[in-house]
């Protein structure tokens, strides 16, 4: 990925509000089949179709305005605890966007005669790499793991892999008829 430097080894893809989709080299390397990369790209296209980037900007701005109205001056907020509820609410919105993008990808894959299990396979590989980093963090700070799920912008990977499996069953049942 241009601009991130040669040492970027994070497997990721993301959609910008402009509709551009950026993919890291590491994500491409992790894909064992083209269908796996297609699944991730369809997920990102789901973000573009549903305008998640723009909606996130609007929601973030609205939360800032509400915080200003309640507190008076956001610049004067030095206590992170005052900003935490807004951050948690925003993380919840992000998780909803991720679920919506997943659903878009699964439905498009079925329409294209591709098994949604490819998404689950790829997500498992991506989170396997991320899990190693999280385990390192948990060793350094054992109390951090429980809080991470509340601060995450993505739903838990096991639930997403399970959803891909359910859509895969629908896909395979349709092929048998």
For each of these PLM feature ranges, what is it?
Residues 1-176:
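A Zn2+-metalloprotease active-site environment signal
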């Amino acid at each position: 990925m241009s601009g991130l430097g040669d040492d970027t080894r994070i497997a990721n893809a993301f959609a910008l509000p402009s509709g551009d989709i950026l993919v890291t080299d590491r994500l491409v390397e992790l894909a064992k089949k083209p269908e796996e990369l297609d699944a991730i790209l369809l997920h990102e296209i789901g973000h573009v179709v549903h305008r998640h980037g723009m909606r996130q900007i609007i929601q973030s701005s609205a939360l800032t305005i509400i915080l200003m109205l309640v507190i008076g001056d956001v610049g004067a907020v030095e206590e992170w605890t005052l900003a935490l509820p807004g951050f948690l609410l925003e993380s919840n919105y992000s998780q909803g966007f991720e679920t919506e993008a997943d659903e878009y990808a699964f439905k498009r894959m079925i329409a294209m005669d591709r098994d949604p299990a490819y998404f689950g396979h790829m997500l498992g590989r991506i989170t396997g790499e991320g899990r190693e980093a999280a385990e390192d963090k948990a060793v350094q700070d054992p109390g951090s793991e429980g809080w991470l799920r509340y601060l995450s912008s993505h739903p838990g990977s096991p639930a997403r892999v399970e959803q891909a499996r359910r859509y895969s069953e629908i896909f395979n049942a349709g092929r048998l008829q």
